[in-house]
Amino acid sequence: MILVKDRTGSKNGTADSTLVGVFDSKRPLYRIVKWLILHIFPPVFRLLYGFRVVGRIPEEKMQNGCISVCNHVHKLDCVMLACVFQDYTMQFLSLESNLHILVAGAIVRLMGGIGLPAKLDGWRPVLKRIKQGLDEGQMLQIYPEGELIDGCRTLRAFQPGAFQITCWFRKPMIPCLLRFYPRFSKSGRRKRDGMELVILEPVDIPTDKKGKRAATELETQIRCQMEAARLAVGREGA
């Protein structure tokens, strides 16, 4: 997903793609959809999941473009991220099939979803769009697990592409984690588990390694942070 500082009304914030149509944060439809998302979904998420945020947005790392990763555990996790990073325009690099999920997929497409190409030659427009966004100070969000598994409590195997792309463009990476936490009523009765987004410390690209070795080291650092945060559920909150 690309997270970018919302530059509506300026020359920035636009990234073209032949894969999912043209994304333009200045177009009325995008602005209407974003307004609806930010005014409707936060209270719904709080009511259904007790949705909350742990950590802080590292704005100092987002000024010149960066890349974030998050586990993929809910059909509307992209909307949850959009609500948390509400001062930013968001674009999502995701499996093409995820962009066609009923309702959720339509929202992602309208918000700037980028479908992973099925063929190698399809990467050219994708990388062009990513570079344009990063050059404008945007933030690319990728789901390294690839497949969406609703309600998954474990951290699944990562695909290397997210970390290779980060090393290619030499941008810092911001790991995020969606996790479930126990909730109780005032009387002490167990309620449906809540959801929280944990924003972890940004990780810079290794300077002493290049290529696949740099990507592997970056993946190891990111996974360690995310796994530690997953196991820390219940010991921290916002």
Description of each model-found segment:
Residues E60-L120:
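Catalytic core of membrane glycerolipid acyltransferases/transacylases, capturing the structured
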